A protein has these predicted regions:
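Short, Lys/Arg-rich, polar N-terminal cytosolic tail immediately upstream
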Residues: 1-8
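Membrane-proximal loop-to-helix boundary features in eukaryotic membrane proteins
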Residues: 4, 131-165
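Hydrophobic membrane-insertion alpha-helices, especially the h-region
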Residues: 14-33, 169
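Aromatic-rich, lipid-facing transmembrane alpha helices and their immediate juxtamembrane interface loops
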Residues: 25-29, 37, 143-150
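Alpha-helical transmembrane signal-anchor/signal-peptide segments
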Residues: 30-56
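Long, solvent-exposed extracytoplasmic domains/loops
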Residues: 48-146
Length: 188
């Protein structure tokens, strides 16, 4: 009877371990995917500058209470989409902090965006991050370059790191499964 109780407890704990493993793996994949560069092709339709502090854009409801910086925002109409398929990008220097893009040229990119906006040129923008209107999150722009109408938006680095990351997690999951099988054999 004691053997059956141990086996039931082990099988339940194995499900819990794999549940925790899946949660950690999913969070890790989303985290890595968030910081990998992504390419989007479209037309720059607008730009703006907002003075911000650590709490976000400065306004009458959020007065400045510390050091402030200018954050550039660039609007992009995505190529091949309808008029509602737009993307707003934050254009902020990362300097030498996380993520390590070592980006110091936000003012230069802002000037390029204004140039391409006036000439209505098709551009390819590189960015990382996600857009969430609920949390006021914007992807951060890392590069702007002119594009032609058949250019690919596929990023080989993004594909490589996503596949590598998933392969590592599959390996860890396989090792975890084999370890639990060994423990189950020892219970028998």
């Amino acid at each position: 009877m004691e053997y059956l109780q141990k086996l039931k407890i082990f099988k339940l704990s194995r499900k819990v371990v794999f549940g925790i493993f899946l949660v950690i793996m999913s969070a890790s994949v989303l985290y890595v995917d968030h910081y990998l560069p992504e390419k989007t092709m479209g037309y720059i339709t607008g730009d703006s500058v907002k003075r911000t502090d650590k709490d976000g854009p400065i306004s009458s409801s959020n007065p400045a209470d510390g050091p402030t910086i200018d954050v550039y925002y660039i609007s992009l109409t995505v190529e091949g989409g309808d008029d509602k398929d737009v993307l707003v990008l934050r254009n902020e220097d990362t300097r030498s902090s996380w993520p390590f893009y070592f980006k110091y040229n936000s003012a230069d990119l802002y000037a390029l965006a204004q140039k391409y906006s006036k000439s209505h040129q098709l551009v390819m923008v590189n960015h990382y991050g996600i857009r969430s209107p609920y949390f006021s999150w914007f992807p951060n722009l890392t590069n702007i370059e002119p594009a032609a109408a058949g250019d690919s938006t596929t990023s080989l680095w993004r594909c490589f790191f996503n596949l590598l990351h998933i392969a590592i997690w599959l390996y860890v999951g396989f090792k975890l499964f084999m370890f639990t099988l060994k423990i189950e054999d020892n219970i028998d």
